C-alpha cells in the first residue's frame, strides 16, 4: 500500500528497508503501520562514515537499556513456545517479563551530539570517525557497515556482561548464540569509532550523559 501511494503521488523515492518492516504476530496480513522520518543536512566535511575510519581507531560502546525494539519476533516466539505470560516475575530480571520487554529504548542523540560538539572544531576534521547504531542484525553486522574495505573490528567480548534478558531468551528457547548475536544487541546500543587519543574524553561525555560506556575493541587491518 505504501509503495503504491508513493507511485500514485509521484513522490519519487521508493519505500524500502525498515520503512516496510514486517511484524509477524501482532499485525494481520491486511494491516500496516505508518511511520515518520526526518532528514537533515550536514556539510560534506562534517560527515561521519567508513571513509574516515582508520586502523588503530578505538570502538567505544554505549550501553543499551534492553531489547531496543529489535528482535521481538524471535522473543515472542520463544516466550509463546515456553508458555510464559507477560505477568510472570522472572528473578533474574528482578521484575515481570512484560516490564522487561517494554523497557523504553535508550536514545543516543544527545550524547552523540555532545561528543561531536566537545571534540570537534570547525577548522579540522573531528576525531569521532563513525557511529554505528546497533539495531536489527546485531553488533557484528551493524559495526561492519561503518568499516571500509580492508579493515575489521576486533571486539573484546570480555569487556562487558551481557544483560540477563538476553541470557533468559537464549536459555528459555535454546537459541544458539549465533542466532542471538545476529538478531539482538546483547547490551550494546551504539558504537562510536574514534581516534585513540580521545577515548577518555568520549567516556567522560557518556558519563556526563549518565550512559554506561566502555572500550569495546579496536579497528585493525584485515590481513593482521
Regions found by a protein language model. Give the residues of each.
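Glycine-rich anion-binding loops of enzyme active sites
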Residues: 1-73, 218
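Acidic, glycine-rich loop-and-beta core segments that form the ion-binding/anion-interacting portion
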Residues: 55-100
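Glycine-/charge-enriched secondary-structure boundary and capping motifs
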Residues: 1-3, 7-14, 27-32, 91-101, ...
Amino acid at each position: 500500500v505504501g509503495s503504491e501511494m508513493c507511485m500514485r503521488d509521484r513522490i519519487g523515492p521508493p519505500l524500502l528497508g525498515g520503512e516496510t518492516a514486517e511484524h509477524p504476530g501482532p499485525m494481520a496480513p491486511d494491516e500496516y503501520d505508518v511511520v515518520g522520518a526526518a532528514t537533515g543536512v550536514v556539510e560534506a566535511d562534517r560527515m561521519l562514515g567508513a571513509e574516515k575510519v582508520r586502523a588503530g581507531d578505538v570502538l567505544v560502546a554505549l550501553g543499551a537499556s534492553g531489547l531496543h525494539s529489535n528482535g521481538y519476533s524471535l522473543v515472542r516466539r520463544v516466550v509463546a513456545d515456553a508458555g510464559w505470560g507477560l505477568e510472570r516475575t522472572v528473578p533474574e530480571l528482578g521484575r515481570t517479563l512484560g516490564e522487561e520487554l517494554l523497557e523504553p529504548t535508550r536514545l543516543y542523540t544527545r550524547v552523540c551530539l555532545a561528543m561531536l560538539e566537545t571534540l570537534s572544531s570547525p577548522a579540522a576534521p573531528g576525531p569521532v570517525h563513525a557511529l554505528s547504531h546497533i539495531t536489527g542484525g546485531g553488533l557484528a553486522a551493524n559495526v561492519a557497515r561503518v568499516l571500509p574495505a580492508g579493515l575489521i573490528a576486533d571486539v573484546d567480548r570480555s569487556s562487558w556482561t551481557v544483560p540477563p534478558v538476553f541470557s533468559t531468551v537464549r536459555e528459555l528457547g535454546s537459541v544458539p548464540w549465533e542466532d542471538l548475536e545476529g538478531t539482538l544487541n546483547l547490551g550494546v546500543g551504539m558504537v562510536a569509532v574514534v581516534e585513540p587519543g580521545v577515548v577518555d574524553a568520549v567516556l567522560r561525555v557518556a558519563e556526563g550523559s549518565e550512559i554506561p560506556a566502555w572500550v569495546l575493541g579496536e579497528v585493525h587491518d584485515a590481513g593482521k
